Amino acid sequence: MIRPSLTVLAFLSAAGACGAAQARSDENLTDQAQVAAAHSVADVVVTGSNIRRANTEGFNPVQVIGREELESSGKSTTADLLRSISANTGNGSNETQNSGWSSGAAGIGLRGLSQKNTLVLLNGRRVANYGFPGGGLSDTFVNLNALPMVATQRLEVLKDGASAVYGSDAVAGVTNIITRQNFQGLEFGASYGLADQGGLETSTAKLVAGHGDLETDGYNILLSLEAYTRNRLDQDQRDLTRSGIYTDLPGGRWNGWSAKGARFLVDGKSVPLLNAQGQCPEGMVLTASAPIDGLSGDTCAINLAPHTTLIPSTDRYQAYLFGTKRLTPQIEAFGEVLYSYVEGASLFGSSPFFTLEGGRFALNAETGLAEPVSNLLPANNPYNPYGVATPIEYTFFDLGRTLKTNESKSYRALAGVRGRHDRFDWEAAVFASGSDERETVSGGFAHRWNLADALADGTLNLHDPAATPQAVLDGIRLSTLRPAESRLYGADFKISGELFNLPAGQVGYAAGVEFRHESLVSSNPWQIDAGLQIRPAIAAVDGERDVWAAYAEFNIPVLSNLDIQVAARADEYSDFGSAFSPKAGVRWKPLEWLALRASASRGFRAPSLSENSASTMISYGSVIDPYDPDLPNSRQSPTFFTVGNTDLEPEKTRSYNLGVVFTPTRDTALSIDWYQIKLDNLIGTGNTTAIVQSNDPADVVRDERGKLQAVYNRYRNLTALETSGFDVDFSQRWRTEGWGTFTVSSAYTHLLEYKRPNAAGGPLLDYAGSNRGATLPAHKATTRLAWNRDVFDANLTWYYTSGYDQVPEVGGQSRVDAYHQFDLYAAWSGLERVTLYAKIENLLDEAPPHDASFPGVRAPYDFGQYDLRGRYFRVGFDVRF
């Protein structure tokens, strides 16, 4: 039931509508420099507020990327463009991180906070989250690759907390994708790109058509179609990663597998792990850098580069339809439909199915617990010369490379009406949004029982894998399908206008109510639940909830140059309860060219459905058990469960912002903003060692003898986090006689602090400028020099990411180097209605800086920050009618 606070908020402003005045409407918005240069500015709604205004400087710092910049950036996806902005400082995910969650999906996380703390909107309204959470279970996000690019008019990135306006998730900021409105004409184009070092061939095609003028014809309809395909980039396609050997780099080793015990079964014979010259199946022999089990010499190794993907392949197809119809002079209907199909595919290197130490598990279908899978080669196997069951180490490359394919089908359908009364504007809408995922994994995985049979009767030829009958391999090979679906249904009503006059001007207001239903269901492949897959990856979610909300916002002119903003929102969740989010801001313009702004707010992030529902993830490892009945304080290998917790409370935030905006001329703009975010009740999981030591029966499961069987690690409200920094945005335009127009713009973010404890109850440690737990560079900037003259346009963009401290020091490396990337873009529109363009990304072919904390995980650099595409060429054309 909705609590009184929602009702009060809903009617507080609506009751004042009788004194409101008509608000003007204009859907065009450019960045700060362009707005300052304009001779007149119509009322607009800017992300972070629901009140229309004509001020060029708002209460909140908003970075606006207009259509012109979208095109001249040369970026072919929204995710690539947003990844490059300075406020996206790190600790986020992108589609190159495909091994742990999903090929082809990408999100955005502002301020170094995870992507679940950044709200993504399409035309000011929410869209459904991606079906597979990142970060294990907790990191829910909107897949940017499922949202339209060619239909976008502008991107607005609010770099301040906005729970008082939008509710949950708007902790670090808001990204609002705004599509073209009242567009007439026809545009189509295509592009082709490829990497200088080979691979990653990319093709795009697009079409945008608009018909009808809303003012003269009473209607407008917009249709956009786009297609994007990109080939996969594997490790063996780059010199840095081709061999998988990084021993010449600080802290480096080979990225592969070798036998880890004292003996290794090769060609049916047990041979020494070391001094294995001539006896390695792939012919790859490395010299051990240190004695192993007291021995020294050479060791067999497997190069995983041909079996591991750096950047997944992607096929993406999208259709977007938006229509507006004027019903009366004061009322119009509008609606939109978005459909997106995205498929991504990647290889991930197989690990040995059998190791000499054991450590492989499968799920017991009856108990739901993981149980060990024997690594013993049966005594009667013809390739076992010992006559007794013997441990082996074996990797099933004869089953084919392990290929993971993700299919995602996303949609949003919306219908609404809006109107103007002589005293206020109003709008109402209903919408449905969803995302359906299918993850297929084939090759490299073995059917537990069919494999056991093949080892028992010797039909799996360990001496010559190529001689194994195809029918035997087909019976062993296991392919799995993991489905997921995310749903979002909602309805809203909002009103805005002007309440009454004060000596300094009109008091503006906005108010509204919202309802939405959210659900997330992710299931295990049936083969896992049946106990057929060895070493299964389990991440299942089943949750849903209803959310009711009401909000109000006021813009109060105190003086002719001093305004105050007051906003509040109340949310009622069916699962955890209620949340109240207030915000206050002030804007003072002492001079025509100078504006000061400040804001303070409280916000929240609701526990994600994967955190507070019936969710389960299984992981593997070991832990010291002080209570083991046979050998206390010995290392044991139970089943580790990460599970949801229905008793979670929301994370609570306090956000502060101070800023100054200079616009001394119509061609000059400079803004400096300081921010601070404090989070309490941060949701996370506990330390497994501490859980076992506590021996709480609710979390630690033992058999009748007291042997450790399972450890349950539940999401809890554990810690706090504090982060602060400042942004600098600058733009300067020079108009010349005969030489065209030059523009320099720069967006810079400095991360001052990012403090959180390593464990609950521990002291706050500063992560800023280091990779302690997550890579958080202290400085990030994007600087562009643009030139246009008649039919020529060109720009040079410099992307800078500072180096960071290696914490703790690894392999003698105490600091990771900075990274510089230069992109060059040029366009020519000398043909009537036709524009030809070319782009070179990473002009100097700069390689990612080596990070010794990534010694053998696909590549020796932080692939959350960088990728190995290298210098990249793209050419294309656009035609406009």
Predicted regions and their residues:
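C-terminal beta-signal and adjacent terminal beta-strands/loops
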Residues: 446, 752, 800-806, 827-881
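N-terminal Sec signal peptide and the immediately downstream disordered periplasmic leader
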Residues: 1-84, 111, 206-211, 329, ...
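Short loop/turn motifs that connect adjacent beta-strands in outer-membrane beta-barrel proteins
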Residues: 147, 182-185, 198, 214-219, ...
